[in-house]
Amino acid sequence: MKALKIPEATITRLSIYSRFLKRLDKKGITTVSSGDIAEGVGVSPAQVRKDLAYFGEFGTRGVGYNVKDLIRYTVKILGLSDPWNLVMVGAGNLGSALVTYREFKDRGFSIVGVFDNDLTKIGKRIADMEVLPLEELSRVVKEHNVRIGIIAVPSKAAQDIADIMVKAGLEALLNFAPISLNLPDDVEVRNVDLSVKLEILTFNLALKEK
């Protein structure tokens, strides 16, 4: 299986399926159909089957999928069989919220270091974490085998911070700054621009009024 041939939308839905399946498992449900999954996450049964077919054959026709088995498969496909350590640069309001975001831990992600270059923030604590100076980034990345970093700084600082993070050895960045980053091709970057998501909502609402 070559990951590059898998549509990113499929990976996104796979994560949603995995989360839904874990909720079913907590309720004691042992078997689920593609129709059940589709209804639970808001897609068609055909879409569920198509997404899963990228990765092999799952389930039994007429019976459905074993919930625990499908959870195990999706977790493995998403690379979540082992926990992932993260670092974050930016100890402002957004960074503080992300540190305490419970879903990270529930999904196997652990923030092991928070950094800032603002002297008024360095040394302070966010939840149970002390904010460290950027000079400590490389050390923490190496000590905790960190491959993924989160950028939670203003857009004017994002490119410089991204360069520092890549130099420290990070291979993938989740960027919350509303700016496109110029980085080497082998660095994975995903941008999260909340204003864009809001503009999609306003577009759809405006469309309804026409």
Swiss-Prot record:
DNA bind region: 16-55
Q: Which UniProt keywords apply?
A: Cytoplasm, DNA-binding, NAD, Repressor, Transcription, Transcription regulation
Instruction: Mention one GO molecular function.
Output: DNA-binding transcription factor activity
Where does this protein reside within or beyond the cell?
Cytoplasm
Top-level division of the source organism's lineage: Bacteria
Q: Which biological processes are named by the entry's GO terms?
A: negative regulation of DNA-templated transcription; response to redox state
Query: Main location per UniProt?
Result: cytoplasm
At which positions is NAD(+) bound? G90, A91, G92, N93, L94, G95
Pfam families attached to this UniProt entry: CoA_binding, Put_DNA-bind_N
Gene Ontology CC entries for this record: cytoplasm
Please give the PANTHER family that the UniProt record associates with this protein. Answer: REDOX-SENSING TRANSCRIPTIONAL REPRESSOR REX, REDOX-SENSING TRANSCRIPTIONAL REPRESSOR REX 1
The similarity annotation says:
Belongs to the transcriptional regulatory Rex family.
Q: What does this protein do?
A: Modulates transcription in response to changes in cellular NADH/NAD(+) redox state.
Note the subunit structure: Homodimer.
Instruction: Check the record and name the NCBIfam families matching this protein.
Output: PRK05472.1-3 (NF003989), PRK05472.2-1 (NF003992), PRK05472.2-2 (NF003993), PRK05472.2-3 (NF003994), PRK05472.2-4 (NF003995), PRK05472.2-5 (NF003996)
State the protein's name. Redox-sensing transcriptional repressor Rex
Native source organism of the sequence: Desulforamulus reducens (strain ATCC BAA-1160 / DSM 100696 / MI-1)
